[in-house]
Amino acid sequence: MKQDNQTGIKHKGEAKTARIPIKVVPLEEKLRKPEWIRAKLPTGQRFFEIKEILRNQKLHTVCEEASCPNIGECFSHGTATFMIMGDICTRRCPFCDVGHGRPNPLDPNEPQHLAESVAAMRLKYVVITSVDRDDLRDGGAQHFADCIQAIRASSPATRIEVLVPDFRGRLELALDILSATPPDVMNHNLETAPRLYKQARPGADYAHSLQLLKDYKTRNPDVTTKSGIMVGLGETDEEVLEVLADLRAHDVDMLTIGQYLQPSNGHLPVLRYVTPDQFKAFEKKAYDMGFRHAAVGAMVRSSYHADQQAREVIE
């Protein structure tokens, strides 16, 4: 059996992106990282406590799997974004550092392990995301719901944000399941402008992702909706504003915009570093358009300070 088809084998970097429709073409000379792109190094006992809890419960975080630059700061403050359903994704998005392959079966004990970890970490706000699971009948929606229910049972005061995949080909079923067990915040990222989807999000569809957000809001008007994009993949400022307008037209409440950073040479190159002034301009436009909260800046990620992002919207 070819290793590529074996269950549980994780491919990263060039091994992951080799088969995408539009190949990754590295720049002859990488753009120099500007001085405003700086991450804080992991420090403090709390960082290592979080790591130990995660390992003991056999849990994954997107902070680790996607090589997030903010991991030191978030772990040190006792926050983490849990990544359920394993650490192997069925998609090959060339901006993302999560591994690709044929995933293992779901762990039926994961919801309980997650709930125990949330309680042990004394989290007031938790973000749950996942790999894409195109191999599952419901795309993993029921597993999300099981995790929400388990956390509600053991930590009823904890606010829950879910960052979901697109549930391609099974959207209605997924919406039914997640409407029966709603989170406090429903997040699904558009990631980039529609012109760049074939290159950056092979297998995804811009209109479908917008429809997911709109349909969930229609079914659950009291649940806050959220989405985010990266800049630096080749989009123009005008395209960024067009995406923002599309999100507002689909009743999305909260927004994140951050700088794309290349995880490895096998990933899409950074084509521009957006300046702090331009991020401020995007933020102003977002509020002018009616977003209830906009987190905009070079180091912003979808779940970075998610508790602070949501506080003024859901309380």
From Swiss-Prot:
The cross-references to Gene3D superfamilies, in alphabetical order and at most eight, read: Aldolase class I
Its chief place of residence is cytoplasm
Q: Which Gene Ontology CC terms are recorded?
A: cytoplasm
The Radical SAM core domain, residue ranges: 75-292
Reaction(s) catalysed by this chain's protein:
[[Fe-S] cluster scaffold protein carrying a second [4Fe-4S](2+) cluster] + N(6)-octanoyl-L-lysyl-[protein] + 2 oxidized [2Fe-2S]-[ferredoxin] + 2 S-adenosyl-L-methionine + 4 H(+) = [[Fe-S] cluster scaffold protein] + N(6)-[(R)-dihydrolipoyl]-L-lysyl-[protein] + 4 Fe(3+) + 2 hydrogen sulfide + 2 5'-deoxyadenosine + 2 L-methionine + 2 reduced [2Fe-2S]-[ferredoxin]
Q: What is its EC number?
A: 2.8.1.8
Q: Which SMART domains match?
A: Elp3 (SM00729)
User: Is Iron found in the keyword set?
Assistant: yes
Coiled coil start-end? none
The alphabetized UniProt keywords are: 4Fe-4S, Cytoplasm, Iron, Iron-sulfur, Metal-binding, S-adenosyl-L-methionine, Transferase
Q: Name one Pfam family in it.
A: Radical_SAM
Identify the pathway. Protein modification; protein lipoylation via endogenous pathway; protein N(6)-(lipoyl)lysine from octanoyl-[acyl-carrier-protein]: step 2/2
Record has Transmembrane helix as a keyword: no
Q: Which cofactor does it need?
A: [4Fe-4S] cluster
Query: How many cofactors are bound and how?
Result: Binds 2 [4Fe-4S] clusters per subunit. One cluster is coordinated with 3 cysteines and an exchangeable S-adenosyl-L-methionine.
Which GO molecular function terms does the record list?
Answer: 4 iron, 4 sulfur cluster binding; lipoate synthase activity; metal ion binding
First-tier enzyme category under EC: transferase
Q: Which cell locations does it reside in?
A: Cytoplasm
Q: Which residues bind [4Fe-4S] cluster 2?
A: C89, C93, C96
Q: Where does [4Fe-4S] cluster 1 bind?
A: C63, C68, C74, S303
Q: Which family does it belong to?
A: Belongs to the radical SAM superfamily. Lipoyl synthase family.
Task: List, alphabetically, the PANTHER family matched.
Answer: LIPOYL SYNTHASE, LIPOYL SYNTHASE, MITOCHONDRIAL
Indicate what this protein is called per its UniProt record: Lipoyl synthase
Which species? Laribacter hongkongensis (strain HLHK9)
Taxonomic placement = Bacteria, Pseudomonadati, Pseudomonadota, Betaproteobacteria, Neisseriales
